[in-house]
């Protein structure tokens, strides 16, 4: 049996329309499941999310409890995998002070899932008055946190990644 490959054009407007429909016609909890599953590193996540949404429009808010359906159970597994990895990183992530004046903290991670934004909220609260960067080397992204609480996630250029790798070669650990 051969697999078909599809070329799908993405549209921000259509994406937002679908996400709004999930919140309004299924539930906010189903929306949160979808948002967590989107960042999964699983190659089949698109099909799992699609099947979950399809069941959601049929079952409504009860879809998040309908794990008797394999498609919903698969979604639950994806979400749990993303959450577990985020929690593990929250527990073990350590920063190095790579610049002293002003102090800049850096942590380099390589998670399976694209969880750097999930980590940002936790560490923004914990290190609110610090400048820090959480660099996800696998997904070529980083969280940049300014002292005082403002943060952003960005895709990095090759030059930015090289600079972060150079900064990471310093020694002091700060946790």
Predicted feature descriptions by range:
Residues 1-175:
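Extended, well-folded catalytic/binding cores that form a central cleft or groove in large enzyme
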């Amino acid at each position: 049996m051969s697999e078909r490959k599809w070329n799908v054009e993405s549209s921000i407007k259509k994406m937002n329309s679908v996400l709004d429909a999930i919140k309004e016609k299924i539930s906010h909890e189903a929306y949160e499941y979808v948002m967590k599953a989107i960042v999964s590193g699983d190659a089949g996540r698109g099909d799992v999310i699609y099947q979950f949404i399809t069941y959601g429009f049929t079952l409504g808010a009860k879809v998040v409890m309908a794990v008797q359906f394999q498609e919903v159970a698969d979604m639950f597994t994806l979400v749990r995998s993303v959450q577990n990895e985020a929690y593990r990183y929250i527990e073990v992530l350590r920063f190095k002070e790579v610049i002293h004046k002003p102090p800049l903290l850096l942590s380099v991670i390589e998670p399976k899932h694209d969880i750097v934004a999930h980590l940002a909220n936790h560490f923004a609260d914990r290190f609110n008055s610090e400048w820090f960067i959480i660099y996800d080397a696998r997904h070529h992204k980083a969280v940049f946190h300014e002292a005082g609480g403002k943060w952003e996630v960005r895709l990095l250029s090759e030059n930015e990644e090289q600079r972060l790798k150079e900064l990471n070669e310093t020694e002091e650990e700060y946790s």
